């Protein structure tokens, strides 16, 4: 992620089905990069339900569920001089006779260990919550909190970095639960109009600034011109970031969206897209494209044309095509 975190010098057991990889079909996966991982990450990949995505530019063929929900994704590595730090989930699975569509974008900073861990564990943690089927909103909040607690407790293995998240769970093609921390965003097209489903957790907003300052932190535009928590991080909520744990929040905003005939499609994307494109622009660009993978590719291509230098990850979910 370009510009979110001020980079510093060197001195300073679930049983779920496998997810899609960044390159190829929704049923495949590939190992990330060529860097040696901490042992804890190797253990995660072999023991948990969701393998890591590729760091390469990639795409996924559109897939359709039994409830006529289709999805496709497209990922582009940025031009910031570091490895891809965006990860995604886009898959269907069955739980208690219900079909679940699981979709997420995890936009990392200061390395990709935290988003990789989230890809492997966050949905499993949500679905393992005992109250998931009776109170999905609280289950999602509980899982976000417990996942972040684990990440912070294992910062020595997972590293100093962090990640934003936007997640969507589609239940039987009828209900969708959207949650986020940070500035990765979900936007729905409803009768042709764009409606933002998530909240951009930026440090300069009144509520976030007050919370940060109450916890002993501060918000400043120095260095640079972007408001940052303690001069470091350009989002007020995120997973990880051990050095800022006292002043950051991992509490998600959660929203329930009943899927009715007015809901056409949803776009999930990292800020590499939203920095250069307004919500309605994104919806207008792809509302006539019925193939969700082609729509996701169109959005990332346009973001590149608008000189986005960040990693760009985009998932399009289309209903009842």
UniProtKB/Swiss-Prot annotation:
Catalytic activity: O-phospho-L-seryl-[protein] + H2O = L-seryl-[protein] + phosphate; O-phospho-L-threonyl-[protein] + H2O = L-threonyl-[protein] + phosphate
Record GO terms (molecular function): metal ion binding; protein serine/threonine phosphatase activity
SMART domains: PP2Cc
Residue span of region Disordered: 1-36, 51-70
Sequence ranges of Low complexity compositional bias: 9-31
GO BP annotation list: signal transduction
Protein keywords: Hydrolase, Magnesium, Manganese, Metal-binding, Protein phosphatase
Cofactor note: Binds 2 magnesium or manganese ions per subunit.
A Pfam family annotated for this UniProt entry: PP2C
PPM-type phosphatase domain span: 70-319
Positions that bind Mn(2+) 2: 107, 271, 310
EC numbers for this chain: 3.1.3.16
This protein's record includes keyword tRNA processing: no
Cofactor(s) required, per the database record: Mg(2+); Mn(2+)
Polar residues compositional bias, start-end: 51-69
Alphabetical list of InterPro entries matching this protein: PP2C, PPM-type-like_dom_sf, PPM-type_phosphatase-like_dom
Family label: Belongs to the PP2C family.
Protein name according to UniProt: Probable protein phosphatase 2C 44
Source organism per UniProt: Oryza sativa subsp. japonica (Rice)
Organism ancestry: Eukaryota, Viridiplantae, Streptophyta, Embryophyta, Tracheophyta
